């Protein structure tokens, strides 16, 4: 029996990668210094896993931005718009330009599209493919990192995304072909990579093929068969670990089991039943091993050793111990680094802390499970086992978790609780009369730049270095400055800027019962952006208003409307580490009731427009389409519960991003929002087609510029996007806004971009009022 790890967090236990990357982008450190910071993180990760006793330690799981972008560079799939830039820049700067866009030395290129990695809160950079796409080995990162580990005496298992999933992760940038047909052009580059690794004596290679958990066409399944047979013919001595995670193989199981690989990795956290399916199928070849993903790589709860050992015993009895590998369910990039860094009992109480395990602890759990399953019992690990059993039993019975009032309120929800008082057509008349907004009303999506100064105020306040009065005074001044800037710029519906908020989920979690927090529980969201998800450990309720004070203050400063800003129940759920002792739908409904109470209180305080951010509704979709309807039913209902306690003339704005809407457009309509704002600019308004084809009746604010890039777009660019939008959506339904909140941007670029955005809206109004006649 061996231990296997699929990937380890690359941000560094103290977010060293974030700090180094941002210093490099700001021109404050050299490329060599950034590369050294990356190397130091890799070495620490390898040593940690080696010392813990991991047999198959991954390499190439490190990335300066994103593992999919790494592979795009490795196989030379560099979009045409970066070719000129590639001539005059290092491959590192080319890489970051592809991720972030670039406006340097007279060059102006937009970033590649970014979207969610399956149903996680990680984002990847979407590969772009053309009909005659050429591939060539461009970067040897995979080989270099394998050699780097070898140089310090650590034999690793290189990890790369498998060729079929890589193509399926991408997007066709022109019509007339299917990206899966590029497989014959792509495979030779994979062969070249595998050849180089074989020459360097690599024994195991992990190929991640998570699309095997999705609904595939017969053609796509046939491509899997072709690819892995070819790899086996060319590299019969390489031990290929084929990793599937996040769900079952489903109808792809027969195809998968026929592939000539050394080991199949199974996610037994998300899909425990597949172990029985495989063992009972009789189709697992006698020379093929199973990697059992029994430790949850995506959540932070301590493993239940008793349950895991039952699964391991079942597999070992059927196949023999020598054919079993033990592993986390997926890469640990979705877990925080180290629970040992949580030393503040006020932030995370000892009772809750004993229920948790982060990446370092999960590695130890995998190693301990191997020892127990192999009969390697000693006094130390016996004590570890006993502690695990006690912690899990304690969690089941803890009074911290259960609130009977919350359970009763949730059970008492009626059909009327998730419906507005009137239909949209009637509400719209009330809102037009009450709000009196122009055509193409302009707004932003909530947050404004959080400067180092603003963040330092919050840190000082938390440390007790600022009094509540001093802190509030500073936030008031910053809020007033934001209101005045928006008024001067000519924005129609203002926001208060969210300067008091650390994170759009954490801020609410800090004020809700049933949530707790970590001090250092950071995980990578994209690039250098890390998030510290709250921990939902028990029943959720709202003891006090959460946002009313600041929204009310901002509204008192201006005669224009100020939006209330809330995070929706599904997003709070999706972006938290969620308790695993009850259905997610039940936890979501509890959160929805808490948000509903806040919406009602905002309305009472005179706030007539309330944004409820739900960027995560689509990412919560199960990977398999046959399970979508059940999820969408409770997710949409939770949103409606949160939004339906107000009068007709109060306008509800959900904000959604990273979304393809075609296949869930009916469910979006079922949310019954007054105005939906969506991320649109990177896709050049393609996303609007779904709304147009559906004849979506409500109002829409398609994002007109990409806030994930520092690039400042011109008003002409935004006018072009608005013209595209107005070609498919009636002009009296269109709003004008950025893609997303502006928290991570700098004030300089934000001000310039919003001035351009308002100019674009004004130009569109003129065009409608004075149409050009042929």
From Swiss-Prot:
Pfam families: Meth_synt_1, Meth_synt_2. Zn(2+) binds at residues 655, 657, 679, 740. SUPFAM superfamilies: UROD/MetE-like. GO terms for molecular function: 5-methyltetrahydropteroyltriglutamate-homocysteine S-methyltransferase activity; zinc ion binding. L-homocysteine binds at residues 445-447, 498, 613. CDD domains: CIMS_C_terminal_like (cd03311), CIMS_N_terminal_like (cd03312). 5-methyltetrahydropteroyltri-L-glutamate binds at residues 15-18, 116, 529-530, 575, 619. Its EC number is 2.1.1.14. Binds 1 zinc ion per subunit. L-methionine binds at residues 445-447, 498, 613. One of its GO terms (biological process) is methylation. The active site is at residue 708. Its cofactor is Zn(2+). It catalyses: 5-methyltetrahydropteroyltri-L-glutamate + L-homocysteine = tetrahydropteroyltri-L-glutamate + L-methionine. Pathway: Amino-acid biosynthesis; L-methionine biosynthesis via de novo pathway; L-methionine from L-homocysteine (MetE route): step 1/1. Catalyzes the transfer of a methyl group from 5-methyltetrahydrofolate to homocysteine resulting in methionine formation. PANTHER family: 5-METHYLTETRAHYDROPTEROYLTRIGLUTAMATE--HOMOCYSTEINE METHYLTRANSFERASE. This is 5-methyltetrahydropteroyltriglutamate--homocysteine methyltransferase. The lineage of its organism: Bacteria, Pseudomonadati, Bacteroidota, Flavobacteriia, Flavobacteriales.
């Amino acid at each position: 029996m061996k231990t296997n790890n699929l990937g380890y967090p690359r941000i560094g236990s103290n977010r060293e990668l974030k700090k180094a990357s941002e210093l490099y982008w700001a021109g404050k450190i050299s490329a060599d210094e950034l590369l050294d910071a990356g190397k130091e993180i890799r070495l620490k990760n390898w040593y940690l896993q080696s010392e813990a006793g991991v047999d198959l330690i991954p390499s190439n799981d490190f990335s300066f931005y994103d593992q999919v972008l790494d592979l795009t560079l490795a196989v030379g799939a560099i979009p045409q718009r970066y070719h000129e830039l590639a001539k005059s820049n290092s491959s590192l700067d080319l890489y970051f330009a592809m991720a972030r866009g670039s406006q340097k030395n007279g060059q102006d290129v937009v970033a590649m599209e970014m979207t969610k990695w399956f149903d996680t809160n990680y984002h990847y950079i979407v590969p772009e493919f053309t009909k005659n796409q050429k591939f060539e080995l461009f970067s040897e990162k995979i080989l270099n990192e394998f050699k780097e580990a070898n140089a310090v005496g650590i034999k690793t298992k290189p990890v790369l995304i498998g060729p079929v999933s890589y193509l399926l992760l991408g997007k066709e940038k022109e019509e007339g072909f299917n990206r899966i047909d590029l497989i014959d052009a792509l495979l030779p580059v994979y062969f070249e990579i595998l050849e180089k690794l074989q020459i360097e004596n690599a024994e195991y290679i992990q190929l991640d093929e998570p699309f095997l958990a999705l609904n595939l066409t017969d053609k796509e399944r046939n491509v899997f068969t072709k690819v892995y047979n070819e790899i086996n013919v060319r590299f019969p001595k390489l031990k290929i670990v084929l990793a599937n995670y996040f769900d079952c193989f489903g109808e792809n199981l027969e195809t998968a089991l026929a592939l000539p690989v050394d080991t199949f990795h199974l996610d037994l956290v998300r899909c425990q039943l597949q172990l029985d399916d495989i063992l009972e199928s009789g189709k697992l070849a006698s020379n093929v091993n199973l990697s059992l993903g029994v430790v949850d790589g995506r959540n932070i709860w301590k493993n239940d050793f008793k349950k895991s050992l039952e699964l391991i015993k079942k597999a070992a009895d059927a196949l023999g111990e020598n054919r079993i590998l033990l592993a986390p369910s997926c890469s640990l990039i979705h877990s925080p680094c180290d629970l040992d860094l949580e030393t503040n009992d006020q932030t995370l109480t000892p009772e809750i802390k004993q229920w948790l395990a982060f990446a370092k602890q999960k590695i130890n759990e995998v190693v301990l499970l191997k020892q127990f399953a192999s009969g390697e019992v000693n006094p130390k690990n016996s004590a570890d086992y006993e502690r695990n059993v006690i912690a899990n039993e304690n969690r089941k019975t803890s009074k911290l978790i259960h609130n009977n009032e919350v359970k009763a309120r949730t059970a008492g929800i009626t059909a009327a609780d998730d419906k507005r008082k009137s239909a949209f057509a009637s509400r719209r008349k009330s809102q037009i009369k009450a709000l009196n907004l122009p055509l193409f009303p302009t707004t932003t999506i909530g947050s404004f730049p959080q400067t180092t100064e603003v963040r330092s105020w919050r840190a000082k306040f938390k440390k007790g270095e600022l009094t509540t009065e001093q802190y509030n005074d500073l936030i008031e001044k910053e809020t007033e400055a934001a209101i005045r800037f928006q008024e001067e710029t000519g924005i129609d519906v203002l926001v208060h800027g969210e300067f008091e908020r650390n994170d759009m989920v954490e801020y609410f979690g800090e004020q809700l019962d049933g949530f707790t927090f970590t001090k250092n529980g950071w995980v990578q969201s994209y690039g250098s952006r890390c998030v510290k998800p709250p921990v939902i450990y028990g029943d959720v309720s709202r003891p006090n208003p959460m946002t009313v004070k600041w929204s009310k203050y901002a509204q008192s400063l201006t005669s224009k409307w100020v939006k209330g800003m809330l995070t929706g129940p599904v997003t709070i759920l999706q972006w938290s580490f969620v308790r695993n002792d009850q259905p997610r739908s039940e936890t979501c409904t509890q959160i929805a009731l808490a948000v509903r109470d806040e919406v009602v209180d905002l309305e009472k305080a005179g706030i007539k427009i309330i944004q409820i951010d739900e960027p995560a509704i689509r990412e919560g979709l199960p990977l398999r389409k046959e399970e979508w309807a059940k999820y969408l039913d409770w997710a949409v209902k939770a949103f409606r519960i949160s939004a339906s306690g107000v009068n007709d003339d109060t306008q509800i704005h959900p904000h959604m991003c990273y979304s393809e809407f075609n296949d869930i457009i009916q469910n979006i309509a079922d949310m019954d929002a007054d105005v939906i704002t969506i991320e649109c600019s990177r896709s050049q308004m393609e996303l609007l087609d779904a709304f147009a084809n559906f004849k979506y009746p409500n109002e829409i604010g398609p994002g007109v510029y990409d806030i994930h890039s520092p690039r400042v777009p011109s008003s002409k660019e935004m006018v072009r996007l608005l013209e595209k939008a107005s070609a498919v959506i009636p002009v009296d339904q269109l709003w004008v806004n950025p893609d997303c909140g502006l928290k991570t941007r700098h004030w300089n670029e934000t001000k310039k971009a919003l001035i351009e955005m308002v100019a674009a809206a004004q130009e569109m109004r003129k065009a409608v009022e004075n149409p050009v006649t042929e």
